[in-house]
Amino acid sequence: MKTLTSAQVRQMFLDFFKEKGHAVEPSASLVPHDDPTLLWINSGVATLKKYFDGRVVPDNPRICNAQKSIRTNDIENVGKTARHHTFFEMLGNFSIGDYFKEEAIEWAWEFLTSDEWIGFDPNLLSVTVHPEDEEAYVLWRDKIGVPEERIIRLEGNFWDIGEGPSGPNTEIFYDRGESYGHDMNDPELYPGGENERYLEVWNLVFSEFNHNPDGSYTPLPKKNIDTGMGLERMVSVIQNVPTNFDTDLFMPIIRAVETISGESYGETKEKDTAFKVIADHIRTVAFAVSDGALPSNEGRGYVLRRLLRRAVRYAKTIHIHRPFMFDLVPVVAEIMKDFYPDVQAKEEFIAKVIKNEEERFHETLNEGLAILSEVIKKERDKGSSQISGEDVFKLYDTYGFPVELTEEYAEDEHMTVDREGFQAEMEKQRERARNARQDVGSMQVQGGALGDIKVESTFVGYENLTAVAHMIELLQNGEIVSEAHEGDTVQILLDETPFYAESGGQVADKGTLKSAEVIIDIKDVKKAPNGQHVHEGVVVSGTAKKGLVVTAEVESALRKGIVKNHTATHLLHQALKDVLGSHVNQAGSLVNENRLRFDFSHFGQVTKEELSQIEKIVNEKIWEGISVAIDLKPIAEAKEMGAMALFGEKYGDIVRVVQVGDYSIELCGGCHVQNTAEIGLFKIASESGIGAGTRRIEAVTGKGAYEELNDQLGILEQAASELKSNTKDVPKRIASLQADLKEVQRENESLLAKLSQAEAGSILEKVTEIGGVKVLTEKVNAKDMNHLRTMVDDLKAKLGSAVIVLGAVQNGKVNISAGVTKDVIEKGLHAGKLVKQAAEICGGGGGGRPDMAQAGGKQPEKLEEALTSVEESVKSVL
C-alpha cells in the first residue's frame, strides 16, 4: 500500500472517476441555498438531490465529488471516539439512471486494489451485502473473485429513509490486523460488527426500489448509484494510524494546540479528548464561517456558538484560559488549501469572527461557572441531582452557556439537567418577544371590515405627490361608516393615492385630503390586509363622506427628507459591505424625514477608522451626483444582476430594482431621490451594538447633517473654553492633562506599594505552622485583585516556603488570592483548589494553577469563615 497524503487521496479519487467519464461536481457551500429542509449540507448526495428527484437533468448522468459536510446530531461523542466528527468530507461517485451494480462494484475494487491507485492488498478486504441481493453477491464472488468467506450477508445492508427511493447496499471493509482485535470468541469481531479491526472504507448504495406510502416496494424505472467514502476514515487506513485524529488532516492542529497549552497529546485519555474536540470543532467553525454562517443564538449560528463554547470548555482541561481558537485558523487553512482555497483567502475574516466570539464568552465564563457552582451546591443541599430548567435558562440567557454545555458540566458533577423546564423557559421568552413585536396598529393582522374590503386602490406616489381621488370607504373604530364629522378620527380608502404606506422601514407620508366640503389632516398610512393604503387622519373641518372627490396632497418637505435618507441607506449598506466585508446584511431599518437607522449583521465592534471610511465613501457617492434608476424586473433577472434581497422578505415574480449607478443595486419598494447629489451631505451620528452579532448605525443627511456638525462644533468650542485653549489645541491640552494625571496616579501607586509592603511585614507575625508548613491566611486591605496578588507575591518571596491565602473586600465584593511555593505543592497542596473552596463559602467561584490562583465572591460577611476553612483544608492534606 502506498504512503499518501489526504490531499493526494482526495485528488486521486476524483481523477479516477473522471477517467471513468464522470463530471466532477465542485464541493458546494455548507449552507444550503435551495433546500429549506437542511440546516447544513450533511452528505455528498445532499447537493445532488435536484438530480435524483428529477427537478434538474444533469448534463452528465455520471457525477463524482468531494463534498464538505457538517453533522452535529451526536456531538457529545466527538473527541471521545476514534471517528466521530462534526465536519468531514465525503468522496462519492453517482449514477443518475446510467450505470448500476456491476460498474459500481468493479470500479470500487479497481480504485482500492490497483497499484495505479490506492493499492490495498485484496486479501485484506471483505464485503457485506443484503441477504436478498443475490446480484451483488454473485458480482463480488464471480466477477471480482472475493472468496465466499469474506462476503458477509447482513440484514442491515438496506438503505431506506421512508417513502421514496431505496435499495440494498454493499460495504467494503479493510482488515487492520490483529493488533486491533484478535479474540476469536468476540461475537462482534467480523466485517460489519462493532470492532476496531475491520474498518468500513466505502458504502455503495443501489437505489433500485421506490418505497410506496402503503409500505410496499416497486422497482424504479431508472436505477441510481449513490456511494460514499469518508475521507478521514480512508486516510487513517492508508496512513496506518489508530484514529482519524492521528492523520495529517488533524495532527498539525493538535501540534499547534500542544504549543499553546504546553500539554502533550497521547498522555492521558482526558487530555486527548480535549485535543480532539478542539481539532474537530475548529475545522467545522472555520469552514462554516467561510461559507457565510456567523455565531448567533438561532439555527446555524447557534451550532457554531455551541461548538466554540464546547471547545473553550475542554481547553480549560489542558490549561488554556484565554481566547486561542482563532490562532488555529491559519493551520486549518494550510492543511486544506489545495482543494479549499476559500478558507485561506478568508483566513483573516474567519479568525476575527472566532476571536470576537471567544472574547465575548470569556467575559462571562468565570462568572457563569461560579453561578453554576452555586446552583449545584443548592440542589445537592436539597438532596436533588437535577439542575432546574429555570437555572439552565439563566445560564443560557445571561452567561451564554448553551444548554448542551451546561449538561456536560452537570455530567462531570454526576447531575442531570431539566430539559423540559429549560424548553418551557425558552417558550416564555419567545412569547415575550412575540408580544413585544406585535404592532397594535398593524393592518396586516386585522380582519373585520378591513379584511372584507376588496375594492382596488392604486398608489401613484412614486411619480406624484398630489392626486385627485374618490373616497371609496370610510371607517371608524373598525366599522364602515358613511360619513365622519369635524374632530373625528377616521380611516379612509382612496381609489388613487400619492401617500406611501409604512413598509420596508420607510415611514408613512403625512399630508392632507381637501375639497370644498372637507379638510382632513392625514397622520399615518398603513396597508390593509388586501393591500390597499389606509389613511388615518382627523377631520379638521367639514364632513367626510363616502364617494366624495378630494385632492390628496403629500407634505413635500417631509417626503424630501425621507427619500434622501432612504437612498443614503442603500449607499450605507453597500459601503458597509465594502469596508467590513460581504458578510454584512441588513437586519432592520427605519427611514424617516429626520434621520435613518440601519441595523446590520457584524461580529465585532466597528472601529473609528472603519466608520470614517464608511462615511467618506457614502459622501463621495453623493458628491459624484450618480443617477438613481428604478425598474421592474422578473425576480430571476434581478438576482442575476446581483440585486441585494433582504433575508426573510417575500417577493413576487416581478420586483422593483433600485440601482445607484454601478455602485448599489437592491430590491426595494420605497421612495428615492433621482440623483445622489440631492442628498447633499451624510453624517454618522452614532454606532452601537444592539445584540449578539448585530450593530446599529444612526445617521443624518442634508440639513440634518449640517445641524449635527454644528452641534459637534459647539461642543468642541465649549470644551476649548473649559480647557482654556483654542479649538485646534484641544487634543494637545487633553494629552497634557492626562500626562499630569498619570504622574499623580504613579505617585499614588508608589505609596500604595509601600503601604502594602508595610502591611505585608506586619502580618508576617501571624504566620502559623501546620505539619511543618508555614501557613498564612488573612483579611487585608487591597484596592483590587492586582494589588492583592502583589501582596501574595511579596509574602511568598519573604517566606520562601509557605501557603498564603489573602482576602479583601472592595465595594461589597470579595477578592481572594492564593500562592503556594513549589516545595509545598509537592506535598499535595494546590492553590487553585484552596481558593475555589474559599470562594464557594463566599458565594462565588474561581480557581487557577497549583502555585497561583484567584477567585471572587458576593458575601463579604463570610470571608473570615472562608479563610479559616483554608487552614482546615491544609491540615487535612498534611
Swiss-Prot record:
Q: Which UniProt keywords apply?
A: Aminoacyl-tRNA synthetase, ATP-binding, Cytoplasm, Ligase, Metal-binding, Nucleotide-binding, Protein biosynthesis, RNA-binding, tRNA-binding, Zinc
- Where is the region Disordered? 846-866
Locate the residues binding Zn(2+): H566, H570, C668, H672
Q: Which reaction equations make up its catalytic activity? A: tRNA(Ala) + L-alanine + ATP = L-alanyl-tRNA(Ala) + AMP + diphosphate
* Class of this enzyme: ligase
Q: Where in the cell is it found?
A: Cytoplasm
State a GO cellular component annotated for this protein: cytosol
Cofactor descriptive note: Binds 1 zinc ion per subunit.
Q: Which cofactor does it need?
A: Zn(2+)
EC number per UniProt: 6.1.1.7
**Gene Ontology terms for molecular function:** alanine-tRNA ligase activity; aminoacyl-tRNA deacylase activity; ATP binding; catalytic activity, acting on a protein; transferase activity; tRNA binding; zinc ion binding
InterPro entries for the chain: aa-tRNA-synth_II/BPL/LPL, Ala-tRNA-lgiase_IIc, Ala-tRNA-ligase_IIc_anticod-bd, Ala-tRNA-synth_IIc_core, Ala-tRNA-synth_IIc_N, Ala-tRNA_ligase, Ala_tRNA_ligase_euk/bac, DHHA1_dom
* Main location per the UniProt record: cytoplasm
What does the record's free text say on domains? Answer: Consists of three domains; the N-terminal catalytic domain, the editing domain and the C-terminal C-Ala domain. The editing domain removes incorrectly charged amino acids, while the C-Ala domain, along with tRNA(Ala), serves as a bridge to cooperatively bring together the editing and aminoacylation centers thus stimulating deacylation of misacylated tRNAs.
Write out the similarity annotation. Answer: Belongs to the class-II aminoacyl-tRNA synthetase family.
| Record protein name field | Alanine--tRNA ligase
Species of origin reads: Bacillus pumilus (strain SAFR-032)
What lineage does the source organism belong to?
Bacteria, Bacillati, Bacillota, Bacilli, Bacillales
